[in-house]
Regions:
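Catalytic nucleophile-loop/oxyanion-hole region of alpha/beta-hydrolase
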Residues: 36-59
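The alpha/beta-hydrolase serine catalytic core
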Residues: 86-219
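Gly/Ala-rich beta-loop-alpha elbow adjacent to hydrolase catalytic centers
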Residues: 67-76
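Aromatic pocket-lining residues of Rossmann-like dinucleotide-binding sites
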Residues: 26, 79-83
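Active-site loop/turn elements of alpha/beta-hydrolase fold enzymes
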Residues: 35-41, 94, 184
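Short, surface-exposed "cap/lid" segments of acyl-processing enzymes
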Residues: 1-40
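Short, surface-exposed alpha-helical segments at coil->helix boundaries
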Residues: 16-20, 49, 163-168
Length: 219
């Protein structure tokens, strides 16, 4: 099966609940999933461009499937729009319109003056500083990347962080996108089994390892 790269959300990390859930599900079927640390341990210096470079190294110029949660979903779309080697994607509550919505949420003047802002980091379980370079860098990227690869979007109808209407509008404009609305919020952690069913079907994941087909040779 084509290698799978999972992109975690903003202020999260490789050990998030969804990332580990999907890693376990794929592993049970003999499929490896890579989960890069997108901030490379430097959250204050985080940028969209820097995260795209991390993805580039993980993909390595070879065919790949991208899975992304929230900001990770937006990053997956950005990357796929620029890299034809991405075969297909699974986007969970993708943070489309991220640059615009961040400009509306935070005062650029105050952020630039102070140099950084406090942000709760869910992966670390504590507050961290995020540098103004994040806002400067994000401004160069499109709100809704246009890609040609097949994509499955999973979005909670009760999402108050990234409203599901954003994904509904996006899917309505792009025939290569399949949208599944879930009875959940932004995190989607209470519908992971139904999500797995959708993901497994979309990616044509085998039910389990065919152990009878595995032979061992002894020299």
């Amino acid at each position: 099966m084509t290698p799978i790269v999972y992109l975690h959300g903003f202020a999260s990390g490789p050990h998030s609940g969804k990332a580990q859930f999907f890693r376990r599900k794929f592993a049970e079927r003999g499929i490896a999933m890579e989960i890069p640390q997108l901030d490379e341990g430097n959250f204050e210096g985080l940028t969209i461009s820097g995260q795209l470079k991390v993805i580039d190294r993980a993909v390595g110029g070879e065919p790949a499937i991208l899975m992304g949660s929230s900001l990770g979903g937006y990053l997956a779309a950005l990357y796929a729009a620029r890299h034809a080697e991405i075969e297909r994607m699974v986007l969970m509550a993708p943070a489309f319109q991220f640059p615009r919505r961040w400009r509306e949420r935070y005062s650029a003047e105050d952020w630039e003056r102070d140099g950084s802002i406090p942000v709760f980091h869910y992966g670390d379980g504590r507050e961290r500083r995020l540098g103004y370079r994040f806002a400067e860098d994000a401004a160069q990227y499109e709100d809704e990347p246009v890609f040609s690869q097949p994509a499955l979007i999973l979005h909670g109808v009760h999402d108050t962080v990234v409203p599901s209407a954003i994904s509904t509008g996006y899917a309505g404009l792009h025939s290569n996108v399949k949208l599944m609305l879930m009875e959940s919020g932004h995190e989607l952690t209470d519908v992971m089994d139904p999500m797995w069913s959708q993901v497994a079907d979309f990616l044509a994941v085998p039910e389990s390892i065919d152990r009878e087909s595995i032979t061992l040779s002894v020299d």
